[in-house]
Amino acid sequence: MTTEDFPKAYNFQDTEPELYVFWEKNGMFKAEASSDKPPYSVIMPPPNVTGVLHMGHALVNTLQDVLVRYKRMSGFEVCWIPGTDHAGIATQAVVERHLQASEGKRRTDYSREDFLKHIWAWKEKSEKVVLSQLRQLGCSCDWDRKRFTMEPLANRAVKKAFKTLFENGYIYRGYYLVNWDPVLQTALADDEVEYEEKDGWLYYIRYRMVGSQESIVVATTRPETSLGDTGIAVSPNDERYASWIGASVEVPFVNRQIPIIGDASVDPTFGTGAVKVTPAHDKDDYLMGTNHHLPMINILTPSGGINENGGPFAGMAKEKAREEILIALEEQGLFVRKEPYKLRVGVSYRSGAVIEPYLSKQWFVSVSEFRGALREFVESQDIKIFPKDFVKNYLSWVNHLRDWCISRQLWWGHRIPVWYHKNDDERVLCYDGEGIPEEVAQDPDSWYQDPDVLDTWFSSGLWPLTCLGWPDENSPDLKKFYPTALLVTGHDILFFWVTRMVLLCSSMSGEKPFSEVFLHGLIFGKSYKRYNDFGEWSYISGKEKLAYDMGEALPDGVVAKWEKLSKSKGNVIDPLEMIATYGTDAVRLTLCSCANRGEQIDLDYRLFEEYKHFANKVWNGARFIFGHISDLQGKDLLAGIDEDSLGLEDFYILDGFNQLIHQLEEAYATYAFDKVATLAYEFFRNDLCSTYIEIIKPTLFGKQGNEASQSTKRTLLAVLLINVLGVLHPVAPFITESLFLRIQDTLGALPEGDGDAFTGHALRMLRSRACMEAPYPKAFDVKIPQDLRESFTLAQRLVYTIRNIRGEMQLDPRLHLKAFVVCSDTTEIQSCIPILQALGGLESIQLLDKEPEKGLYSFGVVDTIRLGIFVPEEHLLKEKGRLEKERVRLERAVENLERLLGDESFCQKANPNLVVAKQEALKNNRIELQGILDKLASFA
């Protein structure tokens, strides 16, 4: 293949889908449970079937794909299992909104069966879109093993786990104060509640004593819940109220007398030191009410209104009830005052509704028995968490575990596998088989199944097991790939999901679900606020925001800030739009380069453009190389490379590649994805293209060396390209595969043989069907002499000096100039000359014993080496003028510093650190001045 056959530009729009079909059609994503390769299994965090993928999905799946491609190339039997999550609350809410908008109907307008048909239809449509988008990302999943959290196998697993825990006493049903979402009308687990700080009020209300004219004043943030009060609590050590403990007060409006109790948990400094106790609507009050055997009176309906226990306020919305209660209290002389107060309000993570503590009969998992095992897995490093900072978060959460509420008042989800006898609600059957229990089948009119479903996280908590075939203990996948090697997920669901997988999977299998966990940060994008003269602001979006994202200066009144991605803030970045604009490889490289190991990932929009340019650089660099290896054949690689024919620059690039491989091994082992991306990027751009290729161009074009050296360079260049494509493949699979297949096509059929230390691994790679199946590159088995490393380091420093001189004198980079070097030992410099000429833009270099006495040149110094560049007279005069200005500036600076440091008063009174800093500045200015004087002397 010649450069004429090689397109000038990389067409990712056509290439990416073609290559994905090629990989999938040839079964390159499939895992074999019967393989004797070491297993490496990963389960995909299943995206919800609620809509399309967002940038968080793009990140987590890119990181997984980078790892599985690397492990596949490293000789592992890789099993990456994709799947989707039924996402009970989220999906039901989305479908309800859809049906209300499209058909004007609510969920309750359908039968349960008909409503579920609508959700299944939604699931099928949404899942198809999600899986298609995962393919666009280049995910090399084993699609034949795709799972869904509500498929029959998952349902069997859920029922098996529920029954096992139930029969062992770890699942129970009871009344408890749950987190109630009044919009979705379901209970939520503690970690499904998000907390916000809001401005509110602290209300002071008077309660009259029974049989007395006295009264007690309490402070509360929720006066409407007084309808459910069953006690007033004070500290037993508070002398103000000591004599009142045991007395009773009247609850306004509901004709109820309640006791005043003493409880050590009451803070005497809060409010008046007396608090009302509403056990059915406050978690602290619930515990207090339980300890003091107080009645628990629920005053709320499932939708958050006031129920029949609310007296004259029954039937009102709670907000309206609060207004009416405050008015009525004031009319009766029971309202004292209100004062501003900061509230910590619980909010549903799904609906955004304010959470109500709500007394309800629910199913729970008792977690106290599992605490020890959950700690031991991580403390013993049987499960390793990366980054390590999250270990303490995990252990802290485990130490404060509360029983997990697993029942949800929804229709979409795994139905709780429990049947109740209609005449005795405590008589239950727990069943994990197909269909219904035999006892129910024999007498169906006497039994009914629990209408609730299980928390989504219950089925997700079994995901590593169900993906591999459990509860079938003889599943080949389970035997080969469990426990899984790694879980990659966001740190925000460490408690939602990761810990529950450890709990459920270990209790079912007796083994950990995974060996390592990598928790990535959450993606933040730049948002822009525009402020007006009154301090009011609004978010900027559209083309104006894009201009700022791409680097346009912000005008006055516009402020930028990194914030979580949010449509309302205008900083959402659609991964599919980025793929369409910049290509999948550019998106993957961008995400990897940002994936540091912190809690926040700042996604700079400009990186997409930068990595698109890099992809073009890879294409153009490969195209240049193809132009010089197009007539290369497999036998040339088989013949190998004569080490004696290698030059300094060859050892440099080989040494650089070896260092790259070692650095990448460390980066992959520690999940430093940002280093994986940037190390490969910098090697290709800086070391291979900008340095090595530039150095050897004269040889490639026949201007230096002989035919043998030209052949060596061409062969080594081909070997380097093959290996670098392998290194880049996990992060940029499409462009690397396209180029790899072109190399295979160029070289044709490969003869038998192993090659040598330089070409052997490249030959093994080329014998693979594709780059993604090729063995991952290894360090070249060649020793790089230390003196050669030092010589190239010297060459780099000299090149820097040359470029600095050219830059200072503003010399045209295309202008090839003559130079000279003065040094005591010319041996080392001799080997550097081709490098200095190629990278410094020099026509020739003379080795001299001393500087020319006169001449139009400018020079620099590296250690004891003086390097001069002969320049045209007009440039030299310009440079002389610049140096004269620098001389005047530095002489004044030295004079001022000498005067200051010669002042005894200053040296005695000034801060010692300041004196030292001035002394250091004087020293540096003197050195710089002497250098300027030396250069000026050469112009004399």
Curated annotation (Swiss-Prot):
PROSITE patterns: AA_TRNA_LIGASE_I. One of its GO terms (molecular function) is ATP binding. It is an enzyme of class 6 (ligase). One of its GO terms (cellular component) is cytosol. The gene is valS. A motif ('KMSKS' region) lies at residues 564-568. Belongs to the class-I aminoacyl-tRNA synthetase family. ValS type 1 subfamily. Pfam families: Anticodon_1 (PF08264), tRNA-synt_1 (PF00133). ATP binds at residue 567. A motif ('HIGH' region) lies at residues 47-57. ValRS has two distinct active sites: one for aminoacylation and one for editing. The misactivated threonine is translocated from the active site to the editing site. The C-terminal coiled-coil domain is crucial for aminoacylation activity. It comes from the Bacteria. GO terms for biological process: valyl-tRNA aminoacylation. This is Valine--tRNA ligase. It is found in: Cytoplasm. Its EC number is 6.1.1.9. SUPFAM superfamilies: Anticodon-binding domain of a subclass of class I aminoacyl-tRNA synthetases, Nucleotidylyl transferase, tRNA-binding arm, ValRS/IleRS/LeuRS editing domain. It catalyses: tRNA(Val) + L-valine + ATP = L-valyl-tRNA(Val) + AMP + diphosphate. Its main location: cytoplasm. Monomer. Residues 873-905 form a coiled coil. Catalyzes the attachment of valine to tRNA(Val). As ValRS can inadvertently accommodate and process structurally similar amino acids such as threonine, to avoid such errors, it has a 'posttransfer' editing activity that hydrolyzes mischarged Thr-tRNA(Val) in a tRNA-dependent manner.
